[in-house]
Protein backbone atom coordinates (compact mmCIF):
# COMPACT_ATOMS: atom_id res chain seq x y z
CA UNK A 1 0.00 0.00 0.00
CA UNK A 2 1.34 3.43 -0.91
CA UNK A 3 1.07 5.31 2.39
CA UNK A 4 2.41 8.57 0.93
CA UNK A 5 -0.31 8.57 -1.73
CA UNK A 6 -3.07 8.29 0.86
CA UNK A 7 -1.47 10.86 3.18
CA UNK A 8 -1.24 13.28 0.26
CA UNK A 9 -4.92 12.61 -0.44
CA UNK A 10 -5.80 13.63 3.15
CA UNK A 11 -3.84 16.85 2.73
CA UNK A 12 -5.74 17.62 -0.48
CA UNK A 13 -9.03 16.91 1.28
CA UNK A 14 -8.00 19.13 4.21
CA UNK A 15 -7.33 22.00 1.80
CA UNK A 16 -10.69 21.36 0.15
CA UNK A 17 -12.33 21.46 3.58
CA UNK A 18 -10.83 24.88 4.27
CA UNK A 19 -12.08 26.16 0.91
CA UNK A 20 -15.58 24.91 1.77
CA UNK A 21 -15.73 26.57 5.19
CA UNK A 22 -14.65 23.57 7.25
CA UNK A 23 -11.68 23.01 9.50
CA UNK A 24 -8.23 22.20 8.09
CA UNK A 25 -8.38 18.46 8.73
CA UNK A 26 -9.30 15.38 6.71
CA UNK A 27 -9.10 11.61 7.05
CA UNK A 28 -9.69 8.53 4.93
CA UNK A 29 -10.16 4.85 5.69
CA UNK A 30 -8.75 2.35 3.21
CA UNK A 31 -9.67 -1.33 3.11
CA UNK A 32 -7.22 -4.21 2.69
CA UNK A 33 -7.51 -3.92 -1.10
CA UNK A 34 -6.51 -0.25 -1.15
CA UNK A 35 -10.05 1.01 -1.77
CA UNK A 36 -11.13 4.18 0.01
CA UNK A 37 -14.23 3.26 2.03
CA UNK A 38 -14.50 6.31 4.26
CA UNK A 39 -13.77 10.01 3.80
CA UNK A 40 -14.06 12.64 6.50
CA UNK A 41 -13.48 16.36 6.59
CA UNK A 42 -13.66 18.49 9.69
CA UNK A 43 -17.16 19.95 9.77
CA UNK A 44 -17.42 21.04 13.41
CA UNK A 45 -18.45 24.60 12.62
CA UNK A 46 -20.50 23.72 9.53
CA UNK A 47 -22.60 21.20 11.50
CA UNK A 48 -22.37 22.91 14.90
CA UNK A 49 -21.20 19.52 16.15
CA UNK A 50 -18.05 19.30 18.29
CA UNK A 51 -17.70 15.61 17.42
CA UNK A 52 -17.61 16.17 13.65
CA UNK A 53 -13.86 15.74 13.42
CA UNK A 54 -12.44 14.30 10.21
CA UNK A 55 -11.40 10.99 11.76
CA UNK A 56 -14.81 10.42 13.32
CA UNK A 57 -16.57 11.29 10.06
CA UNK A 58 -14.33 8.91 8.07
CA UNK A 59 -14.80 6.12 10.62
CA UNK A 60 -18.59 6.56 10.55
CA UNK A 61 -18.71 6.37 6.77
CA UNK A 62 -16.36 3.37 6.59
CA UNK A 63 -18.33 1.48 9.24
CA UNK A 64 -21.57 2.14 7.35
CA UNK A 65 -19.99 0.95 4.11
CA UNK A 66 -18.73 -2.24 5.77
CA UNK A 67 -21.88 -2.68 7.85
CA UNK A 68 -19.61 -3.21 10.84
CA UNK A 69 -18.56 -1.23 13.89
CA UNK A 70 -14.98 -2.40 13.52
CA UNK A 71 -12.45 -1.65 10.81
CA UNK A 72 -10.37 -4.81 10.97
CA UNK A 73 -7.73 -4.95 8.21
CA UNK A 74 -8.31 -1.29 7.35
CA UNK A 75 -5.92 1.65 7.55
CA UNK A 76 -6.82 5.15 8.74
CA UNK A 77 -4.92 8.05 7.20
CA UNK A 78 -5.35 11.51 8.64
CA UNK A 79 -3.90 14.91 7.89
CA UNK A 80 -2.95 15.49 11.53
CA UNK A 81 -2.22 13.51 14.66
CA UNK A 82 -5.59 12.62 16.19
CA UNK A 83 -6.93 14.46 19.23
CA UNK A 84 -7.92 12.50 22.36
CA UNK A 85 -11.57 12.19 21.25
CA UNK A 86 -10.58 10.82 17.86
CA UNK A 87 -8.10 8.44 19.49
CA UNK A 88 -11.02 7.02 21.45
CA UNK A 89 -13.03 6.48 18.27
CA UNK A 90 -10.00 4.93 16.59
CA UNK A 91 -9.46 2.61 19.55
CA UNK A 92 -13.04 1.32 19.38
CA UNK A 93 -13.08 1.05 15.57
CA UNK A 94 -9.88 -1.04 15.66
CA UNK A 95 -8.19 -0.21 12.34
CA UNK A 96 -5.03 -2.21 11.72
CA UNK A 97 -2.86 0.90 11.33
CA UNK A 98 -3.03 4.69 11.60
CA UNK A 99 -0.85 7.18 9.71
CA UNK A 100 -0.85 10.96 10.07
CA UNK A 101 0.84 13.76 8.14
CA UNK A 102 1.27 16.49 10.78
CA UNK A 103 1.89 16.23 14.52
CA UNK A 104 -0.16 17.78 17.31
CA UNK A 105 2.77 20.18 17.79
CA UNK A 106 2.32 21.29 14.17
CA UNK A 107 -1.41 21.76 14.83
CA UNK A 108 -0.77 23.77 18.01
CA UNK A 109 1.58 26.06 16.08
CA UNK A 110 -1.33 27.13 13.85
CA UNK A 111 -3.90 27.52 16.62
CA UNK A 112 -5.30 24.00 17.11
CA UNK A 113 -3.93 23.06 20.52
CA UNK A 114 -5.48 20.27 22.59
CA UNK A 115 -2.94 20.49 25.44
CA UNK A 116 -5.66 21.61 27.86
CA UNK A 117 -7.19 18.13 27.52
CA UNK A 118 -3.99 16.41 28.56
CA UNK A 119 -2.29 18.66 31.15
CA UNK A 120 0.81 16.58 31.89
CA UNK A 121 4.46 17.50 31.85
CA UNK A 122 5.94 18.28 28.44
CA UNK A 123 8.39 15.39 28.57
CA UNK A 124 5.83 12.58 28.78
CA UNK A 125 4.67 12.80 25.13
CA UNK A 126 1.37 14.40 26.08
CA UNK A 127 1.67 18.01 24.92
Q: Which sequence ranges carry the predicted segments?
A:
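Short beta-strand scaffold segments in enzyme catalytic cores
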Residues: 25-31
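Short, basic/aromatic recognition patches
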Residues: 1-20
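Short, glycine-anchored, charge-dense loop/turn motifs used at functional sites
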Residues: 33-37
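Zn2+-dependent cytidine deaminase-like catalytic core
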Residues: 38-127
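Conserved hydrophobic/aromatic pocket- or pore-lining residues that grip, position, or stack substrates
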Residues: 10, 26, 58
Amino acid sequence: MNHNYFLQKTIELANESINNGGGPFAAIVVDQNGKIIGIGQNSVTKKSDPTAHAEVEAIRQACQNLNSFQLDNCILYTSCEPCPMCLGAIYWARPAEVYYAATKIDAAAVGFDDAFICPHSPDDNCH
